[in-house]
From Swiss-Prot:
<dbReference type="GO" id="GO:1990904">
    <property type="term" value="C:ribonucleoprotein complex"/>
</dbReference>
<comment type="function">
    <text>Located on the platform of the 30S subunit.</text>
</comment>
<comment type="subunit">
    <text>Part of the 30S ribosomal subunit.</text>
</comment>
<keyword id="KW-0689">Ribosomal protein</keyword>
<comment type="similarity">
    <text>Belongs to the universal ribosomal protein uS11 family.</text>
</comment>
<dbReference type="Pfam" id="PF00411">
    <property type="entry name" value="Ribosomal_S11"/>
</dbReference>
<dbReference type="InterPro" id="IPR001971">
    <property type="entry name" value="Ribosomal_uS11"/>
</dbReference>
<dbReference type="InterPro" id="IPR019961">
    <property type="entry name" value="Ribosomal_uS11_archaeal"/>
</dbReference>
<protein>
    <recommendedName>
        <fullName>Small ribosomal subunit protein uS11</fullName>
    </recommendedName>
</protein>
<keyword id="KW-0699">rRNA-binding</keyword>
<dbReference type="GO" id="GO:0003735">
    <property type="term" value="F:structural constituent of ribosome"/>
</dbReference>
<dbReference type="GO" id="GO:0005840">
    <property type="term" value="C:ribosome"/>
</dbReference>
<dbReference type="GO" id="GO:0019843">
    <property type="term" value="F:rRNA binding"/>
</dbReference>
<dbReference type="InterPro" id="IPR036967">
    <property type="entry name" value="Ribosomal_uS11_sf"/>
</dbReference>
<dbReference type="InterPro" id="IPR018102">
    <property type="entry name" value="Ribosomal_uS11_CS"/>
</dbReference>
<keyword id="KW-0694">RNA-binding</keyword>
<dbReference type="GO" id="GO:0006412">
    <property type="term" value="P:translation"/>
</dbReference>
Amino acid sequence: MEVNRMNKTGIAHIYASQNNTIIHVTDPTGAETIAMVSGGMVVKNDRDQASPYAAMKAADMVSETLKEHEITDLIIKVRAPGGNKSKIPGPGAQAAIRALSRAGLKIVRIEEVTPIPHDGTKKKGGKRGRRV
């Protein structure tokens, strides 16, 4: 007789800016936090928080917690600062996704959820922009 096991799914919210990478895993409703690790928690120097290495180590810590909670499937939502800031995810986003997949977690889908302004506030830099 075959045992039909239900795959447990989680949602990994990856916020990747130029200064830090935060990996936050919730249940499918988003109400309960299962694991949350940032780049600053795994490296010593502040300048390394956004590095791919820090994101990889953070993803490894998250995957350990997910194995304890018996979560096998992940929906990944990648977010950049957005708004009137950068709309491109930082260097840690790709490394975090790669580390999560290498840890043996099945990635169901990857979504881009960077907030896009619909003519919101003005970007900093003044009338003539940033002069380099």
